[in-house]
UniProtKB/Swiss-Prot annotation:
Heme b b562 binds at H83. One of its GO terms (cellular component) is mitochondrial inner membrane. Heme 1 (or BL or b562) is low-potential and absorbs at about 562 nm, and heme 2 (or BH or b566) is high-potential and absorbs at about 566 nm. Component of the ubiquinol-cytochrome c reductase complex (complex III or cytochrome b-c1 complex) that is part of the mitochondrial respiratory chain. The b-c1 complex mediates electron transfer from ubiquinol to cytochrome c. Contributes to the generation of a proton gradient across the mitochondrial membrane that is then used for ATP synthesis. CDD domains: Cytochrome_b_N. It comes from Sciurus carolinensis (Eastern gray squirrel). It is found in: Mitochondrion inner membrane. Binds 2 heme b groups non-covalently. This is Cytochrome b. Heme b b566 binds at H97. Its cofactor is heme b.
Length: 176
């Protein structure tokens, strides 16, 4: 006698999707982080778009625009906090995803691993730009500290930092 989960039309779908899933036997919860990265990225893009609708580049009104988002925009406080905490969750998932790849030896697949490394650098550069560009003195501090690491490059480091800054120091809003 066959099991009902293998013969009933509706239960057969559930059986093939969850119980008899054609997946490796060593699959674990560590394999969820790639899809969680996609979800975090979608949340970041959507909340970032809504926050960008209220962006102002004037340094005198930048903090007023943040206050406006939190007080006057429907669920603006939620959008702002989802964007801020979503970035942290994104990087936690990213590092766990890389850790899973290291643990399971995915670095032996050179092409796939190298594309992942390139994507990691692209994500870091994008996060840096998102941190430095929009608002206030913390962005100036971030730009100064992070770009000063480039001054460690022999011969061209100092010139490179001044070129990125557009002068001898970061000044005014960086997005106009």
């Amino acid at each position: 006698m066959t099991n009902i989960r293998k013969t009933h039309p509706l239960l057969k779908i559930v059986n093939h999707s969850f119980i008899d899933l054609p997946a490796p036997s060593n699959i674990s919860a560590w394999w969820n982080f790639g899809s969680l990265l996609g979800l975090c990225l979608l949340i970041q893009i959507l909340t970032g778009l809504f926050l960008a609708m209220h962006y102002t580049s004037d340094t005198m009104t930048a903090f007023s625009s943040v206050t406006h988002i939190c007080r006057d925009v429907n669920y603006g406080w939620l959008i702002r906090y989802m964007h801020a905490n979503g970035a942290s969750l994104f990087f936690i998932c990213l590092f766990l995803h890389v850790g899973r790849g290291l643990y399971y030896g995915s670095y032996t697949y050179f092409e796939t691993w190298n594309i992942g490394v390139i994507l990691l650098f692209a994500v870091m550069a994008t996060a840096f730009m998102g941190y430095v560009l929009p608002w206030g003195q913390m962005s100036f501090w971030g730009a100064t500290v992070i770009t000063n690491h480039l001054s460690a490059i022999p011969y061209i480091g100092t010139t490179l930092v001044e070129w990125i800054w557009g002068g001898f120091s970061v000044d005014k809003a960086t997005l106009t």
